[in-house]
Amino acid sequence: MGALTIVAKYMIVAQIEVNGSVDKSDIIGALFSQTEGLLGKDMDLRELQMMGRIGRIEVDIFEKNGKTKAKIHIPSNLDRYETALVAALIESIERVGPYPAAVKVVEIRDLREEKRKKIIEKAKELVKLIEEEILPDTKEIIEKLKEDVAKAEIIEYGPERLPAGPDVDKSDSIIIVEGRADVVNLVKHGYRNVIALEGISRGVPQTIIELSKKKNVTVFIDGDKGGELVLRELLKVAHVDYIARAPPGKEVEQLTAKEIAKALRNKITLEEWLAQQKAAGEKAETPQQPPPQQPVPQQEVREEAQKPAFPFDITKKIDEMLGTLEAEIYDENWTLVKRLPVRELPDFLTTSGDSIYAIILDGITTQRIVDLAAKKGVKIIVTARTGPLTKVPENMQILTFDQLKKVE
């Protein structure tokens, strides 16, 4: 009966040197015959092989100078103690046929350890496969979540049902973009005062024109020729304060949070843009505003009235306010009523029951603020600067920080 095929735990590796010419069968025969009965029937090599406790004995043989050398491999399914005993047993061989012989065990390999190493290496490959192809990246999940939340926050604004962020009405300033995807991307990254043109094939929506009369407007265009065309059409009918542009070749909907922030931080005024177009040799068309929408010249608004008498050093107050992005509300006795962020000023003017005489703000005074202030009877507004103003009450003075510092 031949040896059974076994799943070996260990591999005994030994070398034998025979002082004569022999073949494989001689060596294998010597292993069985010379070890028979030495350690009892339970450790007899033939019995162990028949029971599947050791596997087929392999012998790799070569001769040189009349001597025979061979490497012996014996797979073992015994425990480590019994395997060591078998290894010691075969070292007891002294002859092969008529020739003296010597056997030396070179190593006992733990095949399970080798298998474990292979399993671990394979597991590493599979984990990498899972990470690369199966499990989504955490950043991707967060980006998808942000996008889903942004889409849920998008509203339809005006009779044209333009895609817009939820703060278009609340904010003193708006960002105008081309399409819905641009709105989604900006809202996703925290810019909620954004509204889309939704194309200009049918002209600039009237809603955009009306918003531009009363809010500070930044137009955020794609970094291609199409963005330039959209801007030119918009400038024909709407008031624009600033222009921001995506990096060359990129669209607003593709930008990352850092790219959006950088583009908006580097926005330029309309005047700067027109100067750039002129310098580049392009004939930029200066927007022609319809007569009813023409802003009242700021020079007239600011300088017709005499500078009011302030009960404190206004230059010091301006220096104190600069950089705070806050507004201070005063009554007719110049008593401070409230100090609040500029972004909360419109809501305060709408809901407050306090008597208001003057406002000092480190921000932009828009037409909306002027209208709300007029309803509250405000007589003086001191501001960092102004947006386009189409109507200022005769009994209201609007003075900028720069003007007051020059006077001082």
Swiss-Prot record:
It comes from the Archaea. Its EC number is 2.7.7.101. This is DNA primase DnaG. Forms a ternary complex with MCM helicase and DNA. Component of the archaeal exosome complex. InterPro entries: DnaG_primase, Primase_DnaG_arc, TOPRIM_DnaG/twinkle, TOPRIM_dom. Binds two Mg(2+) per subunit. It catalyses: ssDNA + n NTP = ssDNA/pppN(pN)n-1 hybrid + (n-1) diphosphate.
